[in-house]
C-alpha cells in the first residue's frame, strides 16, 4: 500500500530557484523515492501565467510520485495543511543592493506568510526560509506564527556550508565526502563564519591537513562569505541551482536525518554558545527522527568569539530595524 501523500508548499514558485527545486521534489529527492507528494505553489498574481507553464512541465515529466499540483496567489490556500513549506520567494537582491533595503521590502511578505502558516498549516509543519535576508525573514515569520512549535521555522545556511566544504576539499585535493564536521555560524551574509577548526579531512584535523593559517584567515573565510556576491557579479543574478540544491539538502536532513553528520542550519537560538535567545542563527547541528540538536561543547576561541559576535550584532541590528518597521 502506498503512503499517504505529503503536502509541500513552495513560495516564489515561478522563480529561478524554484525552477531548479520543484522537479527534484517531485522526483523524490526531498522525501524519498517511495513518498508521494502534493505540491502547493504560491506566486504573485502577475506571475501565475508563468507558474502555469512550470506546472505544464511538471506534468510532462510524468513523475510517479507527484500526485497533484495546486497553485494560488493566496498564502492561506497554498499553506493549507502543508507538512513542509519552503519559503523561496522574497524581494530579490540585485547587484549592489544593500541588505537593509531588503528588510523593509520583505518584512510585510513574511509577516503575511507567518500569519498564514500559523492559521492553516499542519501543526507539525517544518518551514525552511530560503528568501533573503533569510535569517531575519525567518525571525519575522516565526514571530507571526506563535501557535507553531518553537523549532518549526528555520532559515537556510546550508548553501554556505556546502560552499565551505567544497572549497576545503578543493584546497586539500580530496572529494567533498572526505570532509566532515564543518560548522557555519551566524547570518547568511558576509559576517557569517565558516569554521573549519573542528572539521576533519579523511579523519585528520583540517587545520593540520591544510597547514596554512593565513589561507584560512585571508582566503577561505572571506571567499566563502562573499561567494554569493561573486556569483551575482559574474552572472548578474543570485545563486539559483546551488541554492535549490542546498534547500533540498537542509530540509532532507532535517526530515530524514543527517546520519550523524554535522550540518549547519539557521535555527532559533536557545542561548547556546552565548548567542542571544530567540535570534535566528546558523549553528552546527545533527538531525535525527525529524528533529535537530545543536552540536554541544565546542571550544570557542577568541577568533571564533569575535566572528560570532559580529554576526550576532548584525542580526540584532536587523531585528531591531524590522521591529521598527512592523511597530513591534
From Swiss-Prot:
What does it catalyze? (S)-malate + NAD(+) = oxaloacetate + NADH + H(+)
Active site at 188
Pfam families per UniProt: Ldh_1_C, Ldh_1_N
Sorted keywords for this record are:
NAD, Oxidoreductase, Tricarboxylic acid cycle
Which Gene3D superfamilies does the UniProt record give?
A: Lactate dehydrogenase/glycoside hydrolase, family 4, C-terminal (3.90.110.10), NAD(P)-binding Rossmann-like Domain (3.40.50.720)
Binding-site residues, substrate: 93, 99, 132, 163
Q: Name one GO biological process term.
A: malate metabolic process
InterPro entries recorded for this chain?
L-lactate/malate_DH, Lactate/malate_DH_C, Lactate/malate_DH_N, Lactate_DH/Glyco_Ohase_4_C, Malate_DH_type2, NAD(P)-bd_dom_sf
Kindly list the positions annotated as binding NAD(+): 12-18, 106, 113, 130-132
Q: Which SUPFAM superfamilies match?
A: LDH C-terminal domain-like, NAD(P)-binding Rossmann-fold domains
What are this entry's molecular-function GO terms?
L-malate dehydrogenase (NAD+) activity
> Which EC number(s) does the record attach to this protein?
1.1.1.37
What job does the chain carry out? Catalyzes the reversible oxidation of malate to oxaloacetate.
| Family stated for the protein in its record | Belongs to the LDH/MDH superfamily. MDH type 2 family.
HAMAP family given in the database record: Malate_dehydrog_2 (MF_01517)
Q: What is this protein called?
A: Malate dehydrogenase 1
Question: Whose protein is this, by species?
Answer: Burkholderia vietnamiensis (strain G4 / LMG 22486)
Q: Which gene underlies this protein?
A: mdh1
Amino acid at each position: 500500500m502506498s503512503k499517504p501523500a505529503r503536502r509541500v508548499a513552495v513560495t516564489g514558485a515561478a522563480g529561478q530557484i524554484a525552477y531548479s527545486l520543484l522537479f527534484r521534489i517531485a522526483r523524490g529527492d526531498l522525501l524519498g523515492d517511495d513518498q508521494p507528494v502534493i505540491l502547493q505553489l504560491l506566486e504573485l498574481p502577475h506571475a501565475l501565467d508563468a507558474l502555469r507553464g512550470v506546472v505544464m512541465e511538471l506534468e510532462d515529466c510524468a513523475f510517479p510520485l507527484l500526485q497533484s499540483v495546486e497553485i494560488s496567489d493566496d498564502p492561506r490556500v497554498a499553506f493549507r495543511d502543508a507538512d513542509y513549506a519552503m519559503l523561496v520567494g522574497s524581494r530579490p537582491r540585485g547587484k549592489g543592493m544593500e541588505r537593509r533595503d531588503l528588510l523593509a521590502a520583505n518584512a510585510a511578505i513574511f509577516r503575511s506568510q507567518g500569519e498564514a502558516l500559523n492559521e492553516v498549516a499542519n501543526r507539525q509543519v517544518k518551514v525552511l526560509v530560503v528568501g533573503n535576508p533569510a535569517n531575519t525573514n525567518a525571525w519575522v515569520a516565526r514571530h507571526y506564527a506563535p501557535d507553531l512549535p518553537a523549532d518549526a521555522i528555520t532559515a537556510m545556511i546550508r548553501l554556505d556550508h556546502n560552499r565551505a566544504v567544497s572549497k576545503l576539499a578543493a584546497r586539500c585535493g580530496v572529494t567533498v565526502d572526505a570532509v566532515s564536521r564543518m560548522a557555519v555560524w551566524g547570518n547568511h551574509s558576509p559576517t557569517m563564519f565558516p569554521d573549519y577548526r573542528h572539521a576533519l579531512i579523511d579523519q585528520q584535523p583540517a587545520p593540520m591537513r591544510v597547514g596554512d593559517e593565513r589561507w584560512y584567515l585571508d582566503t577561505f573565510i572571506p571567499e566563502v562569505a562573499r561567494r554569493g556576491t561573486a556569483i551575482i557579479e559574474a552572472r548578474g543574478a543570485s545563486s539559483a541551482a546551488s541554492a535549490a540544491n542546498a534547500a533540498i539538502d537542509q530540509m532532507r536532513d532535517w526530515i530524514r536525518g543527517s546520519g550523524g553528520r554535522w550540518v549547519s542550519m539557521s535555527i532559533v537560538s536557545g542561548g547556546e554558545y552565548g548567542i542571544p535567545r530567540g535570534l535566528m542563527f546558523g549553528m552546527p547541528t545533527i538531525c535525527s527522527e525529524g528533529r535537530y540538536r545543536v552540536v554541544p561543547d565546542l571550544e570557542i576561541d577568541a577568533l571564533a568569539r569575535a566572528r560570532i559576535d559580529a554576526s550576532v550584532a548584525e542580526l540584532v541590528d536587523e531585528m531591531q530595524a524590522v521591529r521598527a518597521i512592523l511597530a513591534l
